Design a protein with these regions (language model features):
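A beta-strand signature from Gram-negative outer-membrane beta-barrel systems
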Residues: 123, 133-135, 144-189, 778
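C-terminal beta-signal and adjacent terminal beta-strands/loops
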Residues: 528, 693-702, 721-779
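Face-selective signature of the C-terminal outer-membrane beta-barrel domain
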Residues: 248-250, 287-488, 582-585, 625, ...
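Periplasmic N-terminal accessory/gating domains of Gram-negative outer-membrane beta-barrel systems
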Residues: 45, 61-116, 127-143, 153-161, ...
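Membrane-embedded beta-barrel scaffold of Gram-negative outer-membrane proteins
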Residues: 299, 305-323, 513, 519-525, ...
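Transmembrane beta-barrel wall of Gram-negative outer-membrane proteins
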Residues: 192-221, 226-263, 282-305, 459, ...
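Structural signature of Gram-negative outer-membrane beta-barrels, strongest in the C-terminal barrel
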Residues: 402-415, 447-588, 678-682
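Gram-negative outer-membrane beta-barrel transporters
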Residues: 390-395, 400, 467-472, 578-591, ...
Length: 779
C-alpha cells in the first residue's frame, strides 16, 4: 500500500473491519427468529509430543506456545493452499512470494523458512501424518503436493524441538489428514473467480464395522494475474483403515500432477508501467508425485501404545526457465572479461578500459568494458525417491504417585535423487512490457549428478508431574546423516564425495499451572540441520551456481546448530463462551547458519556458513466467541539479525557486503498482525472480515541495511457463507478489498533491460483485488 506509515495503514484497515462488523452486528441484534445455538469447537487440550500417535500431554503441561488450526477453521477460510491458511491465521507466519505464484510461497515462522525452492535455507520441518514431508534433495517443501481438502488440522510446534529431527531449527508443522470414521459423508463443490480461476472438488468418507474409507479430489485452473502465469493443479487423496478394539491400521495414497508458472521478481521501473508485467518468462515448474503411506497403532495395555509407519514417495520435478544474464564484456570483441585469476570480472567493476583483463582463452583484451545482457534457456529435471519407517512406543504410568508419560522411538529415512540440467542460447522476445526468451541453439547438458542420503534418528521425550501443578519435560534425539554425491556425466569426477554428520540434541521445559485458568512455561531446546546435497555441491565462491542449475566440487559446509530459549503464559478468561489468550518470548541462536549469497545477475551464487545469527521476538494472541461473534487477534515481533562481523559476496557490490552484529537479515519483517472476525447476521448467514498487516523488510542483497526497506502493507479481506437450504452452502471471498499495491519480497540486482544497465530494486508484486465464489453440496 503506497503512502503512509505502517501503523497508519493498519489503523485504516482496522477501521474498515470495524465498520463492516458494526453494521453486521446491528443487523444481528434483531433476528426474525430466536438465535439458534452455535456449535462450539472444544479447545485443543492434548498436545502430541511426537510425530506418531502417542500419549500426549494436556495443554497446561506443555512448555511451549503451540498453535493449532482445526477443520472448522480450514473450512471457513475457503483458501486453496496450506501456506495461505497459516499466513492468514497466525501472526508468526508470513509469506514471501518470490515466485509470484500462490502455490509456491516461501513460508516463514519466527524468521525460519519452509520453501519449495531448492537452495532456500530451510529451518522448519514438515510432517504429514507422522511422515517427514521435506524432500530428500534440498529439504524443500512443495505445498502444492498437499491436498488441502483432505487436511483435518495443523499443529505449529515452536522451537528447536529435537523430537522432530532434521531442520527443526525454529519449529515444526504437523499436518493431519481426514479419515472416514471421523469425517463421514459426501461433499461436491465448485468455485470460480478472478483471473480465470475455476475449481471442482469432492470428498467422501464412511465406515462399516471395522472398515473406514475416505477419498478426496481437487482440480483447479488459474490464468494468474501477471502476464504468462497460468497454473493447473490436480490432486487425489485416498485412505482406507481398519480399526478393531485397540488396533488401527491405515493405508494412504496421494497423487499430485501440477503445472505451476510463477514469474518471480521484476524491476520497479517495469512494474510502474505495467504491474502485471514479468521480467523474463517462462518460469515453469511441473511437479508429479505418487506417495504411499502405511501406518498403524496398537494398544498393548491401557498404559502402553505401540505405533509404526512406513512410506515411499516418487517425486519428479521439471523446470523450464528463460533467464536474462548480465556479463561484463569488451566492446571491441564482445568477449566476456576475466581477471588474472580466471574469474569473471564483477559487474561492479565493469567500466573503463579492458586493458589488463582477458577473455575465456586467456587472450588480453584491449577495448572498453561494458555490461551486456544475454538470454539463456535452462531446464532441470529432478527425480527423487524417498522412503522411511518409524517405530515408536508410548507409556504412561505413576512413579511414586506422580504421573509420567514416556515416548521413545527410532526413525530411518532414505533418499535417492538424480539431477540433470541443460542450457541453450536464446534471444529475447518482447511481449508488451514483459520479456520472454526464444531458444536459438541446442540444449547442452551441464550437470548430471546422483545423490544418496540416509538419516537415522533415535529419540525420547518424558513428561513428569512434579506436583499436580508443576510438570517437567525432558527430551533428546541422536541424529546421524550420511550423504553420497556422484557425478554421472563422467566429465566432472571431482563432484564425487561422501559426507557424514551426527549430533545429540537435548531439550528441557517446565510448565506451572499457577491458577486453573493460567499456565506459565519455559523451555530450552536444541536443533540440528545437516547441509543438503544441493548446498554441499555449491559452496565455492569461485564457481557460482545457478540454483539448482549447476553443481561443482566445493569446500565442505558445517552443520547448523540451533539453541532456543522460550518463556510464556497462556490462559482463559470468562468472556463470552471463553476467551483464550497466549503470550511468549523466544530467542533462537544459530551456529554456522547456512546462507546463499547471490553473486551473478541471473541468480548465480554459492552457499557459505555464517558463524552466528539470531531470531528473537514476542508472540501474543487472543481468540474466542461472544454470542454470534467469532474473533481472533494474533501479533508477532521478530528480530532477525546477524551476530557476527563478516563480508558476504554480492551481485551489486564488487567488494562484497560487510555485515556487523545487529544488521537485520533480509526478507524477515519485524511486525506482523492478523485480526479476524465472523458474525452470524441471520440464521445460517455468516459475514466475516480479516486484516493482514505486515511491516517492511530488508531487501535481499542488502544485508548491511544500507538501502530503504521494502514497504510494509495492510490487506483487508471479506468473506461470507450462507446455507439457503439444508446441505447446501454458498460462499464468497473478496481479497485485498482496497486494491492495495504492495510487495512481499524484494532484492537488489542489475536490470538487464535498462539503458544503461544498472542496479535496481526488484520486487514481487502482490495480487490486486480479487473475488471468488463457490457452492458446496453435502449429502
Amino acid at each position: 500500500m503506497r503512502g503512509g506509515s505502517w501503523p497508519s495503514v493498519v489503523v485504516r484497515a482496522l477501521q474498515a473491519v470495524g465498520g463492516v462488523l458494526l453494521a453486521t452486528s446491528v443487523a444481528a441484534q434483531e433476528p426474525t427468529t430466536p438465535p439458534p445455538s452455535i456449535p462450539v469447537l472444544p479447545p485443543v487440550t492434548v498436545i502430541d509430543t511426537a510425530p506418531l500417535p502417542a500419549y500426549g500431554i494436556p495443554l497446561e503441561k506443555y512448555p511451549g506456545n503451540v498453535n493449532s488450526i482445526g477443520p472448522e477453521d480450514l473450512r471457513r477460510q475457503n483458501v486453496d493452499d496450506v501456506a495461505e491458511t497459516l499466513y492468514r491465521r497466525l501472526g508468526s507466519v508470513n509469506i514471501t512470494s518470490a515466485q509470484s505464484n500462490p502455490w509456491q510461497n516461501d513460508v516463514t515462522y519466527r524468521g525460519f523458512l519452509a520453501s519449495p525452492l531448492t537452495g532456500s535455507p530451510i529451518g522448519l520441518s514438515v510432517y504429514l501424518d507422522g511422515m517427514r514431508f521435506n524432500d530428500g534433495f534440498g529439504e524443500t517443501v512443495s505445498w502444492d503436493l498437499i491436498p488441502r481438502l483432505a487436511i483435518a488440522g495443523i499443529d505449529v510446534i515452536p522451537g528447536s524441538n529435537p523430537i522432530f529431527g532434521l531442520n527443526t531449527l525454529g519449529g515444526a508443522l504437523a499436518i493431519h489428514t481426514k479419515n472416514g470414521r471421523e469425517f463421514p459423508g459426501t461433499m461436491l463443490g465448485a468455485s470460480g473467480g478472478s483471473f480465470g480461476r475455476w475449481s471442482v472438488e469432492g470428498e467422501h468418507g464412511g465406515s462399516r464395522g471395522p472398515l473406514d474409507w475416505y477419498v478426496a479430489f481437487n482440480a483447479l485452473d488459474d490464468d494468474g494475474w501477471r502476464d504468462h502465469s497460468p497454473s493447473e493443479l490436480r490432486q487425489i487423496f485416498g485412505t482406507v483403515g481398519l480399526q478393531d478394539r485397540g488396533t488401527r491400521v491405515s493405508l494412504t495414497y496421494i497423487y499430485a500432477n501440477n503445472d505451476l508458472v510463477g514469474n518471480a521478481l521484476a524491476p520497479t521501473s517495469t512494474l510502474a508501467r505495467d504491474r502485471s508485467a514479468v521480467y523474463t518468462f517462462p518460469d515453469q515448474t511441473r511437479n508429479v508425485m505418487h506417495l504411499g503411506h502405511l501406518r498403524g497403532s496398537h494398544q498393548v495395555t491401557d498404559d502402553l501404545l505401540l505405533s509404526a509407519n512406513a512410506f515411499f514417495r516418487d517425486y519428479q520435478r521439471q523446470t523450464f526457465n528463460g533467464d536474462a544474464e548480465v556479463n561484463c564484456v569488451d566492446d571491441a570483441t564482445g568477449e566476456v572479461a576475466f581477471d588474472a585469476s580466471g574469474r569473471r570480472l564483477h559487474l561492479g567493476r565493469c567500466s573503463g578500459s579492458a586493458v589488463g583483463f582477458f577473455d575465456s582463452a586467456g587472450n588480453p583484451l584491449a577495448g572498453t568494458l561494458r555490461r551486456q545482457a544475454e538470454a539463456a534457456d535452462r531446464t532441470t529435471r529432478t527425480h527423487t525417491q524417498d522412503w522411511g519407517t518409524t517405530l515408536q512406543v508410548s507409556h504412561k504410568a505413576s512413579i511414586l504417585g506422580h504421573g509420567n508419560r514416556l515416548t521413545a522411538g527410532v526413525a530411518y529415512d532414505g533418499h535417492l535423487a538424480r539431477f540433470n540440467q541443460r542450457e541453450a542460447d536464446a534471444d529475447f522476445v518482447l511481449s508488451g512490457q514483459s520479456v520472454g526468451t526464444l531458444r536459438t541453439g541446442p540444449f547442452e547438458t551441464r550437470v548430471d549428478v546422483a545423490t544418496e542420503q540416509h538419516n537415522v534418528g533415535v529419540y525420547a521425550t518424558d513428561t513428569f508431574d512434579i506436583t499436580d501443578r508443576w510438570a517437567l519435560t525432558l527430551a533428546g534425539r541422536y541424529q546421524h546423516v550420511d550423504i553420497a554425491i556422484r557425478d554421472r556425466s563422467r566429465h566432472n569426477p571431482a563432484l564425487d564425495g561422501d559426507h557424514a554428520f551426527s549430533r545429540l540434541s537435548p531439550s528441557a521445559g517446565l510448565a506451572f499451572r499457577a491458577l486453573d485458568a493460567l499456565t506459565l512455561f519455559g523451555s530450552y531446546s536444541e536443533g540440528f540441520r545437516a547441509p543438503t546435497a544441493a548446498e554441499l555441491t555449491c559452496a565455492d565462491r569461485n564457481a557460482p551456481c545457478n540454483l539448482p542449475n549447476a553443481f561443482l566440487a566445493d569446500p565442505p559446509l558445517n552443520p547448523v546448530v540451533a539453541r532456543t530459549w522460550e518463556v510464556g503464559a497462556r490462559g482463559t478468561l470468562p468472556f463470552g463462551k471463553q476467551l483464550q489468550w497466549t503470550v511468549a518470548l523466544f530467542r533462537t541462536d544459530l551456529e554456522d547458519d547456512i546462507l546463499f549469497t547471490v553473486t551473478e545477475s541471473a541468480g548465480g551464487g554459492f552457499f557459505r556458513n555464517v558463524s552466528q545469527t539470531r531470531r528473537q521476538g514476542v508472540e501474543a494472541g487472543v481468540s474466542g466467541e461472544w454470542t454470534r461473534l467469532r474473533y481472533f487477534v494474533s501479533y508477532a515481533y521478530t528480530d532477525a539479525t546477524y551476530q557476527t562481523s563478516t563480508t558476504l559476496a554480492s551481485v551489486t557490490e564488487a567488494d562484497g557486503v560487510r555485515v556487523r552484529p545487529g544488521d537485520r537479515i533480509p526478507g524477515i519483517p519485524e511486525h506482523s498482525l492478523k485480526v479476524g472476525a465472523e458474525v452470524e447476521v441471520l440464521n445460517d448467514l455468516w459475514v466475516g472480515a480479516d486484516v493482514i498487516a505486515v511491516s517492511g523488510n530488508v531487501l535481499r542483497g542488502d544485508d548491511a541495511n544500507h538501502h530503504a526497506k521494502l514497504d510494509g502493507y495492510a490487506l483487508l479481506n471479506l468473506n461470507a457463507r450462507y446455507e439457503p437450504i439444508k446441505h447446501v452452502e454458498l460462499w464468497t471471498r473478496l481479497d485485498n478489498v482496497t486494491n492495495a499495491r504492495y510487495a512481499t519480497a524484494g532484492a537488489l540486482n542489475f536490470n538487464a533491460f535498462a539503458s544503461p544497465i544498472g542496479v535496481e530494486r526488484f520486487v514481487s508484486p502482490g495480487s490486486p483485488i480479487a473475488a471468488y465464489a463457490g457452492v458446496r453440496v453435502r449429502f
